[in-house]
Amino acid sequence: CCSKFGYCGLTDAYNFYTGQLTSFAHVTHETGNNAYCDPSKTQKPCAAGKKYYGRGPIQISXNYNYGPAGRAIGMDGLGNPDRVAQDALDDYKTALXFLVNGEEAVPGLSAANAVSYYRQYCQQLGVDPGPNL
């Protein structure tokens, strides 16, 4: 399991790069490649002038996550997405809703997406993602 850069096995350098790739995959997953408003999600329409980028400890993002997560905690996630960053209690309620309810609270929340992004970054950098995904 060596990269094209010569890192083999579980060396410190290999662990560093796989950690960085994991971070990149997480950021890509949470920002949706900067597509914060998906107009095809008509059940969770975007409010005019609102931005649905990553906020809070779980980095909730995109209108299709803010709507259900807001409903799960009794907040208008679509109409006031900034509240996640402005209100500490709602911030952590949102995180708990994701941790406890996952896919039930927020359809589309998928570890498979993050794994897919991780594999894409590994491929682009010539690094073996390893067998434990």
From Swiss-Prot:
The active site is at E30 (proton donor). It comes from the Eukaryota. InterPro entries: Glyco_hydro_19_cat, Lysozyme-like_dom_sf. Its EC number is 3.2.1.14. The keyword Repeat does not apply. SUPFAM superfamilies: Lysozyme-like. This protein functions both as an alpha-amylase inhibitor and as a chitinase. This is Alpha-amylase inhibitor/endochitinase.
